[in-house]
Amino acid sequence: MFRAAAAGPYDEAINKATDENLTSEDWGAIMEVCDRVATDANGAKEAVNSMIKRLAHRNANVQLYTLEVANALSQNCGKNMHRELSSRAFTDALLKLANDRNTHTQVKAKILERMKEWSDMFKSDSDLGIMYDAYYRLKQSNPTLQPPSAPQKNVLTDADRQKEEEELQMALQLSLQEEERKKRPAGASGATASSSSGGAAAGPSNAGGAVASGEGTNSTAGQAEATPQPVPSSTTAATVSRVRALYDFVPSEPGELEFKKGDVIAVLKSVYKDWWSGSLKGKTGIFPLNYVEKLADPTPEELQREAQMEAEVFAEIKNVEKLLTLLSAGNTGPREEDNEEISKLYHQTLAIRPKLIKLIEKYSQKKDDFTQLNEKFIKARRDYEALLESSMSHPPGPTYHQYAMRPPMTNSYGSGGYGAPPPQQQQEPPRFYNPAPAQDAPQYPATSPSPNPNHFIRPAGTPAPYYMGGAEGPGQLQHQQQPPYPQQQPQPAYGAPSRPQDQQRNPSGPSPMAPAPLNTTSSPPPGNQYTPYQAPGASGANNRTNSYSSTNGGAPQELSTSAYDSPIAQHSTNPLSNPSYNAPSAPSYSQGRPGAPTDDPYGPTSPGAGSSNNVGSAPPPPSGPAPSGPAPSAPSAPSAPSAPGAPNSYTQGAYHSQNPYAAAAAAAAAAASRTHVPGVYDGAGSEVSSTAPQPPAALQPGGGAQPQYKAYVPPGAPSAPGSGQEGPSAPGQNDGLADYYRSAY
């Protein structure tokens, strides 16, 4: 009478994707169905007809897999599939299955969930409104299928926090009491043990509202599974450690915890009044209390019963192994007695199957918990190692001590001028030859210092070069090793009183920058300042100084002069023509130069004793009358330097001053015989030739320029060779006289 429905083209593929023996969704088979439907014009209608047949199956797993296939087709097969899913035939099949009382609760909840998703997906198309109507009718007829709405996130008040703290203290107190009861002797009476058990069971009842007793444990647990009760709002997180999810929860805001029905969540703390913070599968977030139920901590009786059940299951392991051996080792035909034993062992194994499933679930959950704990531990260890490595790779830098900065060293005298005391400052220890210490004597102040920035000042603590006995002194050797630089010496103004030879300045005194004291016999009149003469191209040689040896202990003495003396010969001048502003009886500080006419402003005022360059004291001037002969109209030239080892240069100078013509001939011969002075260097480090007269440089220790005197140049006289312009000249220069005049001090 009844014909079986004709098999559709998609029945086999959909039956494979919704097989009742599957343990999970077969996504390979599901995607194969989606590919076939997407390429077939009539595939959407045929696939929906095949799914309606599978929804009529009585197995809940087949129904759940069919709903999953329908959801995959709706997301991958376009609008044609949307139209078939919103058809009257498919929606009626869904409503019929959901309203059947024999349908599993999970299947009903899944139907409601999928219909809601499809309603939201099809709401933009008015032709697909049948799905929304079917969803609205199902929600009205089955209000319990829909999960409750999440409560509002009300902030905890001070009273709520105080209550939570009180419950926490109560729970801690009960826990301590339980520990004390466990530590009591084992020989306690049974009444005491029973009362302790009753108190332990009553503790959670007072704290969290969970009712549990030693006799009705199984019945209470069974009722809890049948009708789960949400966590009451009066319960706090202080007394609850675990909760089980009653519904699926999808987060709607960041920070919320997603979970499925049946998940066990570890409670951490209270965040809002009806929201707690928990941890699940390595994730932390907040969840609503009306979606979960409280899990009471197991009592000692429950723990003992669970351990007994595990022992019974493990005792049956040998029967399971024996059954497997009989089933796998029988190569020949089964005997009758073996069949009886196999049947007996099989029934014994079936008896422990429910207990075995519970143990599998328990240890599977423990395995997941330990896996999550291991992951957290590994992450924490990696973070610690990373922090440790970063701290070791960037050690703190060494601490450096701050040293006091050396005060700046000045290279010139202060503004006090000649004779001003040097500034008291810390100086670097000298690294050169130090002559004999200077004599202590009062210093003579300068008459009128005037700064001149065009000249350099010799740094403090550096000895001036000098010559001693025809050999270079340490100062000159030092200048050969280091780069040469101009040095200057103080020069007194014109007409300054002279000082004796035995009180000349010593550069090795305690204050090397201080000038030597002067012994004066009369107060000097205000002297006139004159601009020093400088010839171009001779700036390097103008800054050279010379020093002489004195008879005071044989120590080398520094004597400033504007002329370059030969290291092997000493100049000598006529003491009679040596000019000085002082009286003839006063000792002269400056070197003498030949006399000049009285109308010459640079000429001498009175004959004075000239200072000599010879080793020893200067001889007294001749007391005889002046030599006869015509008076020269120009200053006579100084005598040429004598050859090395000259016995007495003073007598030669005196003889030439008395015989002008003999002096000119001797000077010409001496100039022709010498070409340069060895050991004498200019500012650039090259030797200075003595054939060209070098004008003196203005030397100023205190910043003021001291007067220099230009030699008289007769009209029409040629300039000095190499100077570039007219320089100092003297009678007889055309005859070969190459010396120059020393400036008077």
Curated annotation (Swiss-Prot):
Residue intervals of the SH3 domain: 238-297
Residues in VHS domain copies: 17-146
Membrane topology: Peripheral membrane protein
Database matches in InterPro entries: ENTH_VHS, GAT_dom, SH3-like_dom_sf, SH3_domain, STAM, UIM_dom, VHS_dom
GO biological process, one term: protein transport to vacuole involved in ubiquitin-dependent protein catabolic process via the multivesicular body sorting pathway
Superkingdom as given in the UniProt entry: Eukaryota
Subcellular location: Endosome membrane
Name of protein: Class E vacuolar protein-sorting machinery protein hse1
Lineage, top ranks: Eukaryota, Fungi, Dikarya, Ascomycota, Pezizomycotina
Encoding gene (name): hse1
